[in-house]
Design a protein with these regions (language model features):
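Short linear capping/connector segments at secondary-structure termini
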Residues: 1-2, 111
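Helix-loop-strand module that forms the ligand-binding subsite of alpha/beta enzymes
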Residues: 2-92, 96
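Glycine-rich phosphate/pyrophosphate-binding loop and the adjoining helix
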Residues: 79-81, 90-185
């Protein structure tokens, strides 16, 4: 027994849900996927065709319409192709779930460089964008597409990113991190 029953109740009562997960193998983490799978009891087992789409009807008819936002960060510097699996999953989630609507997608590429002090301005800009988006969704019920796009600007070239990432892995800290996670065969 765990707290999933309580989490489903909390989720049902929320006006807005923010799903946030680092990008792992082009999708959400295993823990997030398990959580999403365990939301299935919030739907009835029957079939419903709505707007040409077959879905399960929502179990709780008194639940209100609910919006959700997706946030994910990746070590790779490009949004294109890297977030496709995650995007597809949540767009299907939105189209197959009654009373839910995807209100925004925030993808943060090249997140691993955020820890470097030289990228403090970028980190501050991202924080400001997220705060503005939060205010927009509460006050206006939507997020400006330009705001979502602004988050994806890494402000560095892919070549610079690659060089910095590779240099980290060549350092003693990088080697220790890598070797600690790799099993000996």
């Amino acid at each position: 027994k765990d707290d999933m029953t309580e989490l489903r109740i909390t989720l049902r009562e929320a006006d807005l849900v923010i799903y946030s997960s680092p990008l792992y193998i082009f999708n959400v983490t295993g823990i997030m996927k398990n959580f999403l799978d365990r939301l299935l009891p919030n739907m009835k087992p029957y079939m419903l065709i709505k707007d040409g789409q077959t879905m399960h009807p929502h179990r709780y008819e008194d639940d209100k319409e609910q919006g959700f936002v997706v946030f994910s960060a990746s070590g790779f510097p490009e949004v294109e192709h890297n977030f496709d699996g995650l995007t597809s999953s949540f767009r299907c989630f939105s189209s197959h779930m009654e009373n839910t609507s995807l209100m925004g997608e925030f993808f943060l590429p090249a997140a691993e460089v955020m820890a470097h002090p030289v990228y403090k301005k970028r980190k501050d800009k991202i924080s400001e964008i997220c705060q503005t988006a939060g205010k927009q969704i509460v006050n206006e019920g939507k997020i400006d597409i330009d705001l979502m796009s602004a988050l994806t600007d890494t402000e560095i070239t892919n070549t610079t990113f690659q060089s910095q990432a590779d240099n980290f892995w060549k350092t003693l800290d990088g080697k220790k991190s890598y070797l600690k996670e790799v099993p000996k065969l």
